[in-house]
């Protein structure tokens, strides 16, 4: 593990000049301001001003603050330490905790509290009382570890799997043959043994005796025979009655020749992962409403017998119910939902036979599984929570369901950032051996799309999972990942997360294997309030108004279900989302690069969409157009509704071609004819591969092979801040204007007039990092577009608030350019843009470990403290203070910028004895003009805080035992053993 250092480049003061924004007619020019000029020259004349409150920062509410997953290791908690943990989080700016009990700590078994026991509920009640005093929100996991399950789940309610045994029948009339299977998979080999029989047996009495005993010994106590299909040698099929089986033996006439397929409902036997005491046991069957009802009874009992309140929300983690591809009720539910008997198509379900029939049967199976998960788990679980005054927060990814429908059925859809994104931001330290982020923008948008379309107020995220190796997560690295979440519609972030730790526990305290360690044992925790204030400011804007993405993008789920090969069981795991529908994933990124934003929509959600007042209207948002991208397979009902919307005035666009195939097997030819008939009614030529557009009722249908040409017909104006300047953005509609959150997530800067796609009478800028706000410099171009002057460096972000009416008065948001600094150097006078802070620095170790006394001198530029020749310096974790006295030249400057270049990791600044701010994110710079004395001697103190990496490396080098946790204990981002002694 590399040692963390202080900096790599010289610390410099940069003189900056305010730029005067000169507006003349419809053209805009820039000129440097003199020292006496200020931004007042760009003042907007007051007119009917918007409400004053709209130009202020929103008041911060609890839900604006970030939350954190709070792991209770072994539930070995006590009231005193619970209070200390909560108070620490509150002081750091955390607004919500989600209690998730997990495995325990070695040697602390006496402190463990069984899940939902009276003692556990007493601890929950204490947390709720303390949280109420601190104005914090308390959520809780719907189980321990993940997925849902535990000791009350017996095999009858446990997660289930397909189990198939196959028996070749040779057909014999000479003797009674006993046939048995030797394994329990779909590719089983079989053996045939003949039992003795007397010569007096007649031909008609000869039987084939099939031994149906399950060969997998682990499954024998649980497997339930569900179907017997005889496939004759001529291809004919017969479903045999289960009643014919006696003591695991099925007798068939000796002359039957072909194959017998036996289908069982087996059990995955998966245990709850990372379970806490009292939560150990089998994983429940998420496809069974009966199993869910049985599972939830334990919560009803625990809360009825306790004074604890029901939590604000119950949480369900990503779907990791491995291999649960069956359920006792599946055959019957399939028959009711798909209108045919799946038993007759077991070979196709197993991937054998006509490829088209295989695809259609597998599609029907996948759709049925998806509906069962929605109808038997997600919806009733949410209804159960509502009946108790709670909500549901759920991660649908990883499941076999239609993610959009699952997310829409819960109260707070939650996505997940997993790994580290390569943003290519200057001076941002990113370790080489890191796991790349699987939660790319196209994947993150499933949760927020469902929230927007269905009208949910919040989209949450499990944030920063495996962002770095342990002890390596900087605030600077967190910020762009958070910005990426905001840009994709997340407005309620939860850290991953906070291990509960007793105050008296030896450092590094109690740890969770995939945590970024949001607690006081992390050195950087002292500066987390700055990050959390930033998050709260952003979320205060992003939780208000309505989404304004304008384009609906149809998710061609049936193309995936019907055409995606591999096994019949298909899940949407975050790590491989792009593999399932790469064209769709690529299209989303291409649209966004072109300056557009969108929400995805499912067939079910589309059926609830209306067209009125010139817009497509869903329960939660309004849109200008809908696009069906590269879709081959579509139910006639979906196309029928699209055409209904077009007749009423909607613009429906098809990219590439139009869908001409229907999903599923039942009455496929009849439904295909319905689809063709619908196309014939439109007048579109479905075999034409060039752009075409037809009027349809009051609306328009457009087909185009080229995305850019298609979007020109959409009536949607792209945002040039993205397509030209490279700024990422998300936009929300307020009653009196719009709100943009913009961020530069690439290695480029913006210093230009930038048009807004939405009209505005006036604009405010809000800087969520500093809390600064002011009216925006505005102008118009030749196309009469609103222009605002944006000056944004890599890593920076901004909130843009527009108003439909009224003008704003006051100094506009400052725009700076570097100025020249004249200073003496060996009788010479040099003019430079930067003044290096060099001289006689002093340094001392402040708050941290190990304790290192004394003051150290550094000449010239300050050096990393790891270079000091003093025992313990290379193991130190905490804060060190650098001090310097220097004379500031008396030059013409409107402000001064302190530029660190590189910083590891945060720096608190004091100028002339006054707190001047905290530097913690890229670019590592801060304005100091209000604190400096031009032409006089000044003092600067820089309190730098590093990460715990050096200290934990020292622990490993010295063999100190700190890995004291059960289950998985501590592993690397790749789930491999790891030491930090390098």
Summary of predicted features, one role per range:
Residues 49-96:
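Mature N-terminal segment immediately following signal peptide/propeptide cleavage
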Residues 82-83, 96, 113-146, 152-153, ...:
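Carbohydrate-binding surfaces of carbohydrate-active enzymes
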Residues 926-937, 943-948:
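Short, surface-exposed tryptophan/glycine-enriched loops
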Residues 102-187, 201-242, 252, 260-266, ...:
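Acidic/aromatic-lined carbohydrate-recognition and catalytic surfaces
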Residues 10-22:
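Bacterial N-terminal signal peptides
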């Amino acid at each position: 593990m590399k040692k963390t250092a202080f900096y790599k480049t010289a610390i410099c003061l940069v003189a900056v000049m305010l730029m005067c924004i000169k507006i003349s007619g419809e053209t805009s020019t820039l000129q440097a301001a003199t020292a006496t000029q200020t931004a007042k020259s760009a003042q907007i004349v007051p007119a009917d001003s918007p409400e004053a409150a709209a130009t202020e920062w929103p008041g911060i509410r609890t839900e604006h603050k970030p939350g954190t997953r709070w792991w209770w290791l072994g539930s070995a908690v006590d009231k005193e330490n619970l209070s200390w943990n909560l108070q620490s989080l509150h002081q750091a700016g955390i607004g919500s905790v989600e209690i998730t009990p997990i495995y325990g700590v070695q040697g602390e078994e006496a402190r463990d509290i069984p899940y939902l026991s009276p003692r556990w509920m007493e601890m929950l009640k204490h947390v709720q009382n303390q949280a109420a005093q601190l104005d914090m929100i308390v959520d809780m996991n719907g189980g321990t570890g993940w997925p849902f399950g535990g000791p009350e789940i017996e095999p009858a309610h446990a997660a289930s799997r397909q189990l198939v045994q196959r028996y070749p029948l040779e057909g014999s009339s000479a003797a009674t043959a006993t046939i048995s299977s030797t394994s329990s998979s779909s590719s089983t080999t079989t053996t045939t043994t003949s039992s003795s029989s007397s010569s007096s047996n007649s031909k008609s009495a000869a039987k084939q005796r099939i031994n149906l005993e399950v060969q997998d010994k682990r499954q024998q106590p649980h497997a339930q025979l569900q179907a017997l299909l005889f496939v004759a040698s001529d291809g004919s099929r017969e479903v045999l009655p289960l009643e014919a089986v006696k003591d695991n033996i099925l007798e068939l006439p000796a002359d039957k020749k072909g194959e017998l397929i036996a289908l069982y409902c087996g059990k995955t036997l998966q245990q709850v992962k990372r379970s806490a005491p009292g939560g150990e046991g089998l994983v429940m069957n998420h496809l069974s409403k009966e199993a869910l009802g049985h599972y939830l009874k334990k919560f009803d009992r625990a809360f009825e017998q306790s004074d604890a309140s029901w939590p604000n929300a119950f949480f369900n983690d990503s779907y990791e119910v491995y291999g649960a591809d069956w359920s006792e009720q599946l055959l019957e539910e399939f028959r009711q939902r798909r209108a045919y008997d799946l038993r007759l198509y077991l070979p196709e379900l197993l991937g054998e036979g006509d490829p088209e029939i295989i695809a259609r049967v597998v599609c029907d199976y996948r759709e049925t599984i998806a509906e069962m998960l929605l109808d038997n788990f997600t919806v009733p679980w949410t209804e159960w929570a509502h009946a108790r005054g709670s909500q549901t927060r759920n991660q649908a990814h990883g499941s076999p369901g239609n993610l959009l429908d699952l997310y829409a059925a819960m109260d707070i859809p939650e996505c997940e950032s997993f790994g580290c994104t390569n943003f290519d931001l200057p001076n941002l330290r990113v370790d080489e051996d890191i796991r790349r982020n699987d939660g790319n923008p196209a994947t993150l948008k499933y949760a927020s799309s469902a929230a927007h379309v269905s009208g949910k107020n919040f989209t949450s995220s499990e944030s920063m999972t495996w962002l770095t190796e342990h002890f390596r997560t900087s605030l600077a690295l967190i910020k762009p990942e958070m910005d990426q979440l905001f840009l994709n519609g997340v407005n309620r972030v939860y850290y991953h997360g906070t291990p509960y730790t007793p105050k008296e526990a030896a450092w590094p305290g109690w740890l969770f294997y995939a945590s970024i360690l949001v607690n006081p044992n992390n050195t950087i925790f002292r500066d987390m309030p700055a990050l959390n204030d930033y998050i709260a400011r952003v979320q205060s804007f992003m939780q208000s108004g309505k989404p304004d993405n304008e384009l609906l993008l149809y998710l061609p789920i049936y193309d995936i279900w019907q055409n995606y090969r591999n096994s019949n069981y298909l899940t949407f795991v975050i790590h491989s989302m792009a593999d399932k529908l790469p064209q769709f994933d690529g299209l989303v990124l291409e649209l966004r690069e072109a300056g557009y934003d969108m929400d995805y929509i499912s067939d079910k959600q589309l059926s609830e969409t209306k067209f009125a007042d010139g817009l497509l209207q869903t329960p939660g948002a309004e849109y200008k157009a809908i696009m069906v991208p590269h879709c081959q397979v579509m139910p006639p009902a979906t196309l029928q509704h699209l055409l209904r919307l077009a007749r009423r005035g909607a613009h429906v666009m098809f990219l590439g071609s139009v869908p001409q195939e229907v999903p599923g097997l039942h009455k496929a030819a009849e439904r295909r004819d319905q689809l063709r008939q619908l196309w014939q009614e439109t007048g579109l030529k479905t075999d034409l591969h060039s752009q075409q557009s037809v009027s349809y009722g009051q609306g328009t249908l457009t087909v185009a092979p080229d995305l850019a040409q298609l979007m020109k017909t959409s009536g949607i104006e792209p945002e040039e801040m993205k397509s030209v300047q490279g700024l990422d953005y998300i936009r929300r509609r307020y009653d009196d204007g719009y709100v943009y959150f913009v961020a530069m997530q690439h290695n480029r800067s913006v210093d230009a007039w930038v048009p807004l796609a939405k009209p505005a009478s006036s604009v405010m800028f809000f800087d969520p990092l500093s809390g600064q706000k002011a009216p925006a410099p505005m102008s118009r171009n030749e196309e009469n577009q609103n222009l605002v002057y944006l000056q944004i460096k890599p890593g920076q972000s901004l909130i843009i608030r527009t108003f439909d009416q009224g003008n704003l008065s006051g100094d506009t948001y400052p725009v700076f350019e570097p100025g020249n600094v004249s200073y003496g150097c060996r009788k010479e006078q040099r003019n430079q843009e930067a003044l290096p802070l060099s001289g006689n620095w002093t340094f001392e170790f402040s708050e941290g470990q190990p304790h290192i006394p004394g003051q150290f001198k550094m000449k010239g530029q300050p050096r990393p403290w790891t270079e000091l020749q003093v025992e313990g310096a290379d193991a130190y974790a905490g804060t060190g203070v650098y001090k310097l006295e220097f004379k500031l030249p008396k030059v013409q400057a409107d402000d001064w910028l302190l530029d660190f270049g590189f910083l590891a990791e945060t720096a608190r600044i004091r100028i002339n004895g006054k707190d001047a701010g905290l530097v913690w994110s890229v670019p590592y710079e801060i304005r100091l003009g209000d604190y400096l004395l031009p032409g006089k001697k000044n003092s600067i103190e820089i309190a730098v805080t590093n990460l715990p990496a050096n200290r934990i490396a020292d622990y490993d080098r010295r063999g100190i035992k700190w890995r004291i946790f059960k289950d998985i204990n501590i592993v690397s981002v790749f789930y491999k053993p790891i030491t930090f002694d390098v």
